[in-house]
Amino acid sequence: INFNDFERARTSDDTEISGFRNCYQKVLSKEFDKKIYECVGKVLQKYADTFVHFSTGLTTEDTGYMHLIYKGSEKGEYKTHTDHFDLYPRVLSCSFILNDKYDGGDFSFFDGEHVVKKKTGSVVVFPSNFCFPHAVTPVTNGDRHAIITWIR
């Protein structure tokens, strides 16, 4: 993915992004945004407790939240990519799985070598760097909902 593709993906609203991402993005209410913020704090604490050498530097902040909807009727997907770019440095990526009543739409790493099991309410946390290429495979039935954020 090149910078122009990344920039379009980062700023999109309800559009397909240059063949890399085919999903819809919804804005979260301020009330829900606060709830997610609290969840992210708990997730980060658990991550830091598990990986004692984890550090983002002097300050830690998230980049806001996006509700992504991958529609089965449109084969919604996000092709293999990484989340860190020099202009938008990110340390950790977080994907909250909001539902599991859909087919396809697997969150996978390393060209499908590792597939994350779908479970409503779970969160996937991983380093944003080049060592963790990941994708969402096409949804074939139902709609996949997730909230994503990045920590920098």
For the regions a language model picked out, list residue spans one by one.
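Residue-level preference for beta-strand/loop junctions
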Residues: 59, 76, 88-90, 143
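Short, conserved beta-strand element in jelly-roll/cupin
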Residues: 67-72, 85-103, 150-151
